[in-house]
Amino acid sequence: MDYVYKANITIYGNELSGIFIAKRINDTTHRVVFTTEFGNKLLDFEISENDFKVNSIVDELDRKILINTLKTDFRLLLKNSYVIQQQYDNSASKVYLTEEDSSNNYLFISKADNKLNKIVNATKRKERINLFFTSENNIFAIKIVIQHYNIKLRIELNYLQTQIN
């Protein structure tokens, strides 16, 4: 299935907008493409749990810190399953803890509708990334916001359609 979103990216006060496309290539790999609204490709990645390949990227975005940050973001966003270590409850959500490498992921499932509404990626001491989801069903989110706390980066994705031909 292809996921197509209108994307707005704010990085250090600079704004980019365009189209974000994520396509599942096989069971483990996704291809992620970000283009301008006119169709010019800004970045093109292939990403899986263990592999990452940059197919193309424009010179202005070709920075190691940005590429590694986007790799982390897209892995969190496109991950199919998590190994849960602990479960917590708060007033609004069931919270599931997963531990990966040097960070923890907290998955917040709404008690009201039983949908994923937030993923928090954190070190032992502080939050690094929050992913917020607004969805109408359990297949895809109509809005996704990726907010960083260690760098000035915010990505907002608004759903356009489910398939492109």
Range-by-range predicted roles:
Residues 1-12:
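A short, Trp-centered hydrophobic/proline-enriched beta-strand micro-motif
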Residues 94-165:
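Gly/Pro-enriched, hydrophobic low-complexity segments
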Residues 33-42, 52:
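Membrane-embedded segments
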Residues 41-46, 64-68, 128-132, 153-156:
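A short, polar/proline- and glycine-enriched secondary-structure boundary/capping micro-motif
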Residues 15-23:
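Conserved interaction-surface patches within small, structured recognition/assembly domains
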Residues 31-33, 53, 117-118, 143:
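General beta-strand recognition
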Residues 52-84:
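Acidic/charged, solvent-exposed loop-and-adjacent secondary-structure segments enriched in E/D, K/R, S/T
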Residues 1, 23-28, 47, 135-140:
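Edge/loop elements at the starts and ends of beta-strands within beta-rich repeat scaffolds
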